[in-house]
Amino acid sequence: MLETVKLVTKRDGSVEPYDEKVVRSRIVNLMSGIDSYYVDVDDLVRVVGEGVREGMSTSMLDELLAETAAYCVTKHPDYGLLAGRLAVTALHKTTTESVLDSFRVLHEHVSQATKRHAPLISEELWDIANKHSAALQQIINYERDFDFEYFGYKTLERSYLLRVHKGRGVMEVVERPQQMFLRVALGIHGEDLERVKETYDYMSQGFFTHATPTLFNAGTPFPQMSSCFLVAMREDSIDGIYDTLKQCAIISKSAGGIGIHMHNIRAAGSYIAGTNGTSNGLVPMLRVWNNTARYVDQGGGKRKGAFAIYLEPWHADIFGFLLLKKNTGKEDQRARDLFYGLWIPDLFMERVESHGTWTLMDPNTAPFLSDCYGQEFTDLYERYEREGRGVRTIQAQELWFLILESQVETGVPFMLYKDACNFKSNQKNLGTIKCSNLCTEIVEYTSRDEVAVCNLASIALPRFVKDGAFDYVALKEVTKVVTRNLNRVIDRNHYPVCEARYSNLRHRPVGIGVQGLADAFALLSLPFAHPEAKKLNRQIFETIYIAAVEASTELAEKDGPYETFKGSPASEGKLQFDLWDEERRIRGMNEDSVHSHCGLWDWDSLKERVVKVGMRNSLLIAPMPTASTSQILGNNECIEPFTSNIYVRRVLSGEFPVVNKHLVKELIRLRLWNDDMRRKIIALNGSVSGIKEIPERIRELYKVVWEIRQKDLIDMAADRGRYIDQSQSLNLFLATPTSSQLTSMHFYSWKKGLKTGMYYLRSQPAADAIKFTLDPKAMKELPKPDKQSKEEVHGSVGRGKRKRVGEKPTANHSNAGAPNLNGPPDTDGDGGCLNCGS
């Protein structure tokens, strides 16, 4: 019987027979550097051929081809690279390689809604493109588009690459990835083509990336490039509350995530002199904020609006606050679309530890508690207690256990330590810092006149692993480029509210983070918590910090120090590690987290230079979540261990299988990688710990985060914390958390001096997802990986150093309010961060 010839429809409307030879040739042409032993071209062509339908368009065929390759990625990670190349070639067919023509399409865009000219790039960028078109064409290198894996490319396609209207509601991507990088470089540096080329080359080769808002908006008519905004509640009045809400709505429609403190809002039942009535308190008000966050998104389906609400635990509405995100209870007492953080004074932790009482206060009758920290706070709080100003007195542990219960069920509230954040801040001369941002890595001063802002970028650490060693010199060079770029963004940024511009130009903070720390360890064959990995962790962050300080000092020599430099710790020769040492001496804390510098860099002469000429930026280092941009560059997220070695990641752009490429390469080298091994790893939820045929060294190297002691993660956070002048987004991971485990972790983090004790608590579902690819009988035969025991997770945390805080029963909740935790979290393209991450 003759095989029916299938016809496909070309882009010009003509039809032609489907030709497997053409498809095969196209794949073969993209196989450079791909392992042809594991990537079976013939099988791929066969499967695609079976999926071809009569009349299918060639664009749909391109999509089928790329998706078919992508879903084979669990067989070998090179399938992901091949799929990315197939998708990129499809994009290149419909876009121009001419930089000038590409910018012309964006500049001449006409809105389908208004039929008016609606350019997607700025007039400045269009003028530069016309003036320097030949030079820009020489700078750009389209071959680098073929370095993206499919997951990374689809993330770009979904949200980052600029689109134009094609009628009937259709939006078409007209920007190539390389053109996006060039747009960003031009948006930051304008006509300084030397800096444009430098930035473009480093970004397009994956050494660093600017944060998502910068990639979205640089070079556009409204270049809002900032990731994070911190807002102060203006005042405790209807005018103050709604003015602040309006301010947040304006920021949210075009910007990143927002952190806001509510410490000064009077509690429920508090007297209102103007009406002779009583206040409804925080909870009803926060439901209004919740609805605003839902309503005011950031346009075009790119990102949801998101607010993180911070509250100190002495506030009389704290119990209702802790219930707002829970899954059960009265709807009028819930606001689940907001995020919640605690701004915790040391005194509260001391009262919990000593089984003491805790007095809840109303800021209307016990004012100024949020305006002070340290001993000044303790003195004022205890004075109010003696004066009987409290609303009610409870056992401190009663509140503590409600905090833990909320974290087990929802993953929040975040835990930030007010005294550490303030004492170790280079902005402490400005006043008391009252909150962090949506992702807990930004710690900046706010007031009714100042909205704190931060511009972010992340450095891709795997790019600095060369020939089995880490290249600190190259890391320093790239960090200085990033610092100069972020400083430039401050001046070229579009600010949604005037208070943000005022603050950012005065203090000029930036936030430099990292991605791919776990990848760098894997490339160097270092298990995550190995002593050499811990040493590398310290050296990486010391190098980043000294490079950033040095670059900021060089900028100050040229342009002058930031306006409020005088009186800052840096102006007195105190950098971040000096503040850590000073804090520990003042508090009489042990010195177990103090380490000498790595010896590579000359800190003494740099500090002398800082005192002499100043710094251009008040703050520099802030390791943030990097969910979106690490997806783009193909790295593990930020500072975290691998969450799983095989999993499916769900984002706005689709569901994608992800496999640990480093593990696969090791298993190939050992001749252990095959379908049977792949199925075993899937059956064990991405763990290799229970697979005895894998050598112990490899099993240790590829432990997933659930198998790593959280004490080690906290120790490493404290080690690098000496070189982090803002804070860090530190997630903690417990498969089945108990109150005892959580208490142990929180107190250990606090005593180690961390500013952010916990971003999200990640836990695992009570039952494994059904694995449809496995025979149930085969699953029974598989050994299970070792679960974290209490001792394994925490070691000697708190042992012999403090009185054990009382145990409560294990809370039997999955982390329903936090992202899916059977692997990395479900995201909308930005993980738990949603808006703020790099």
Curated annotation (Swiss-Prot):
Gene3D superfamilies listed in its UniProt record: 3.20.70.20
Keyword Oxidoreductase: yes
InterPro entries per record: ATP-cone_dom (IPR005144), NrdE_NrdA_C (IPR013346), RNR_lg_C (IPR000788), RNR_lsu_N (IPR013509), RNR_R1-su_N (IPR008926), Rrm1 (IPR039718)
GO biological process: deoxyribonucleotide biosynthetic process; DNA replication
Annotated SUPFAM superfamilies: PFL-like glycyl radical enzymes (SSF51998), R1 subunit of ribonucleotide reductase, N-terminal domain (SSF48168)
Keywords per UniProt: Allosteric enzyme, ATP-binding, Deoxyribonucleotide synthesis, Disulfide bond, Nucleotide-binding, Oxidoreductase
Residues where GDP binds: 227, 437, 441, 626-629
Activity regulation, per record: Under complex allosteric control mediated by deoxynucleoside triphosphates and ATP binding to separate specificity and activation sites on the large subunit. The type of nucleotide bound at the specificity site determines substrate preference. It seems probable that ATP makes the enzyme reduce CDP and UDP, dGTP favors ADP reduction and dTTP favors GDP reduction. Stimulated by ATP and inhibited by dATP binding to the activity site.
Domain ATP-cone: 6-97
GO CC annotation, single: nucleoplasm
Site feature location: Important for hydrogen atom transfer: 228, 454
Catalytic residues, chain numbering: 437 (proton acceptor), 439 (cysteine radical intermediate), 441 (proton acceptor)
Sites where the protein binds ATP: 10-11, 16-22, 58, 62
UniProt record similarity statement: Belongs to the ribonucleoside diphosphate reductase large chain family.
PANTHER family found in the cross-reference section: RIBONUCLEOSIDE-DIPHOSPHATE REDUCTASE LARGE CHAIN, RIBONUCLEOSIDE-DIPHOSPHATE REDUCTASE LARGE SUBUNIT
Protein name: Ribonucleoside-diphosphate reductase large subunit
Naturally occurring in which organism (per UniProt): Trypanosoma brucei brucei
Lineage: Eukaryota, Discoba, Euglenozoa, Kinetoplastea, Metakinetoplastina
Gene behind this protein: RNR1
